[in-house]
Amino acid sequence: MILKEEHPHQSIETAANAARQAQVRWRMAHLKALSRTRTPAHGNCCGRVVSKNHFFKHSRAFLWFLLCNLVMNADAFAHSQLLINVQNQGGEVIQESITSNIGEDLITLEFQKTDGTLITQVIDFRNEVQILKALVLGEEERGQSQYQVMCFATKFNKGDFISSAAMAKLRQKNPHTIRTPEEDKGRETFTMSSWVQLNRSLPITRHLQGLCAEAMDATYVRDVDLKAWAELPGSSISSLEAATEKFPDTLSTRCNEVSSLWAPCLCNLETCIGWYPCGLKYCKGKGVAGADSSGAQQQAQPTNYRCGIKTCRKCTQFTYYVRQKQQCLWDEXRRGELQLMQMRCARRRNGSEFGDDASATCPGGETRAATTTATITGGGAGGSGKDTTAATTTTTNKLRQLLLLVQQQMPFALWSFPVHHISQSHHQSQSQHKPSRQQKQHQHHSQVAPTSHHQSSSSTPPTPSTSSSPPSSSSSSSSSAMAAIVA
């Protein structure tokens, strides 16, 4: 159990001990102050002898002092904070800060990702609003500012997070322990449909304007959530819609499919909260036996009390409109991987590349890989020639993939070498270094003959074998293609 709540009886005893210690500290502090002023132990007040404690108890300063302490302690009890060390799926450890505000009925969760992105999640239980703020560091070498801020306001379901009152009562036994969640809730996708005008965002929640002041043009909301908030008491759909501005209806292009940095597109931003308290755990306790109206003794009924929490992990992906692709450069990083995967699948469907990863990427790859392997293994005298062609083609395709990936990741570089030159150099080198069929058969028989003779002497049936090392044509083709890339 990671975080444990205090037992009801234990919490009462703890509060009583804290009150006694505070009273003792207060009395000692004021006794020292009196001794410094050399006040006599007893004084005369209208002919009566009074003590120092009597003076403080009946003075107005003492009453004001108690009132100020109560106010300060109430504010301290209303805000509680936990620092949690969380290990993400990549094995890296980040620190989460979870703050509970009972007076405002708020919970704030904040952490910084390993790439520098600052994530802030605010949950407003009164208005059932969840705000996720992302501060992403910019790429100054590509013309971006130092950072950009986005805010996403969505409908919050009260069962997804423990209440602010329960959060304030949680205590951490070992603050330095690295936490892992008990349950993974997967990924939830939100498609935003409107901007939020922060100067009119009061009908949604009054915390939105202060939290997202740096995201004046980058605060987003969904129409579905507006309709859900309109059903709450004291809210109306007209006031909610007046605080929003809808996206253009004609755009449906993803940013990772757009080449121009100044064209509008749909951006994707994904973030994961690696650890948060998503529910409460209850323990059974012994009840107090009592008597009924007739005086008969009743059996003690077991009672349930809160004794711990359930922890979860959840990822969220937001899809929203940006006026320029320049505001969504992080979505471009997956473009090269996606295109490279599509190229591999297309070549495997044509039978031009063989590999173990074909079945994991393209549908139907297992059948094609098995058929191709069986054909190469049982090819007889022509097996080595097929291996040579397959190895040469695979090497050339990998070089082309590498060049395409570098061009996609560096759009501002001036590449004067076209990709199709690799295929041309491959055909030229293949025509120059291609041996005759008789020479290949002679080499194959010279390699297979000793093996078959040795196998016949041991009275075992011969098995067809293929050469493990690629011939010289593959190495010459690879070297010529690599020289073309370097040029």
From Swiss-Prot:
Name this protein carries in UniProt: Out at first protein
Transmembrane regions: none
Region (Disordered): 423-487
Keyword entries, A-Z: Developmental protein
Annotated Low complexity bias: 423-433, 456-480
Organism expressing this protein natively: Drosophila melanogaster
Note: Readthrough of the terminator UGA may occur between the codons for 332-Glu and 334-Arg.
Coiled-coil stretches noted in the UniProt entry, renumbered to this chain: none
Domain of life, per lineage: Eukaryota
Family: Belongs to the OAF family.
Stated role: Vital for proper neuronal development and hatching.
Free-text tissue specificity from the UniProt record: Embryonic expression is in small clusters of cells along posterior margin of most segments, brain and segmentally repeating pattern along midline of nerve cord. Expressed in embryonic, larval and adult gonads of both sexes, and larval imaginal disks.
Pfam families, alphabetized: OAF_C, OAF_N
Basic residues bias: start-end ranges: 434-445
